[in-house]
Amino acid sequence: MAPAQAKRIKTLSVARPIVYGNTAKKMGDVRPAIAPSEHTHMWTIFVRGPQGEDISYFIKKVVFKLHETYPNPVRVVDAPPFELTETGWGEFEINVKVHFVDEANEKMLNFYHHLRLHPYTEEDGRRSDGDEVSSVFYDEIVFNEPNEAFFAKMIEQPGNLLPSNKTPDCVFSLQLEQEEIDRIQQGIGKVDEEIEQLKQKLEQDLAK
């Protein structure tokens, strides 16, 4: 809990970027001794900084709730890296609960991630490189009106800024953001063009 004297700073917010998701790879002849015979894949689920930065200054622990068929399905990771590696054969929803450091005095963040084991197909526009499947998402955690103690702790850190360009190890970047903006603008332009064509056709039909 935050100290009683730690007042919240009105009209101010602090954001920190994270990436979360999972990677998976099909197991071959070499497999963990404890892996059940029916398990086909090894996977890792995680919550990280965009470039692997230390995020333990604002995240205290991450709780992963696996499918009930796993022994001890509620797994607590209370030190970085906030990740969990397991084996399995099927995809399922993993409940992820992010608990913040005591100074934050904030409620936990609760969300779900669909564990992806198999490659995306080309039909849905997504792909996985090589034999490793990756299902990773970028998000930003926003702390509205943080208390003074937590705000002071946050500004001591650089803020996990996105890199300018994409790299094999970090696709989330300002370059990717601009590419998404360009795609959206192209889509809007195409819709505007089709609307104008339809408008002209309607005007021609009415003039007949």
Curated annotation (Swiss-Prot):
The keyword Magnesium does not apply. One of its GO terms (biological process) is DNA repair. Residues 8-157 form the YEATS domain. It is found in: Cytoplasm; Nucleus. Keywords: Activator, Chromatin regulator, Coiled coil, Cytoplasm, DNA damage, DNA repair, Nucleus, Transcription, Transcription regulation. Pfam families: YEATS (PF03366). Its main location: cytoplasm. It comes from the Eukaryota. GO terms for molecular function: histone binding. Residues 176-208 form a coiled coil. GO terms for cellular component: cytoplasm; NuA4 histone acetyltransferase complex; nucleus; Swr1 complex. PROSITE patterns: YEATS. CDD domains: YEATS_Yaf9_like (cd16908). Belongs to the YAF9 family. PANTHER family: PROTEIN AF-9 HOMOLOG. Component of the SWR1 complex which mediates the ATP-dependent exchange of histone H2A for the H2A variant HZT1 leading to transcriptional regulation of selected genes by chromatin remodeling. Component of the NuA4 histone acetyltransferase complex which is involved in transcriptional activation of selected genes principally by acetylation of nucleosomal histones H4 and H2A. The NuA4 complex is also involved in DNA repair. Yaf9 may also be required for viability in conditions in which the structural integrity of the spindle is compromised. The coiled-coil domain is required for assembly into the NuA4 complex. Component of the SWR1 chromatin-remodeling complex and of the NuA4 histone acetyltransferase complex. This is Protein AF-9 homolog.
